[in-house]
């Protein structure tokens, strides 16, 4: 695909992702939304399924010749690998969505020959979108420099903490180390 086509696609996906935010947040803010579980035990919500439906409707309308692999409908049975496909996760971080931590995203990517070509990640809870095209130089953003605190910063999933993770945190605590967990 040519660069101008990719820029048009990324713009369309950004608009689509932004249009999903109010729908997803309406469910997120509902105190009584239901959660069910897939065969693998992972949770799925009405927001997952609504996002899935709206994203697939858009992609099938505008890009009908490109197959779609979505977390909410993918099964390996009968799957034929494609050189080009959409990779979709309507709510990445469903456990965080259910726990109302705000740490969940909507992800849409175009994959060609096993490599990501472009992608959009939207964070409805903070009203932000990140996007990129792999053939272009990434946009740079100046980072704010801060004085480091005395706390160790540890990147660890809040939803998937293991016994080993807990033992490690206990070890640090017993040895007087301050810890800040970043999820």
Residue ranges and their predicted role:
Residues 1-91, 162-178:
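N-terminal subdomain of lithium-sensitive/metallo-dependent phosphomonoesterases centered on the IMPase/IPPase/PAP
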Residues 31-33, 42, 95-96, 102, ...:
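Flexible, active-site-adjacent loop/turn segments at secondary-structure boundaries
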Residues 68, 86, 106, 154-155:
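Well-ordered beta-strand positions enriched in small/hydrophobic/aromatic, beta-favoring residues
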Residues 108-183:
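Acidic beta-strand-loop-alpha-helix segment within the catalytic core
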Residues 77-78, 95-98, 129:
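Conserved protein kinase catalytic core
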Residues 82-124:
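Glycine-rich active-site/cofactor-binding loop and its immediate structural neighborhood
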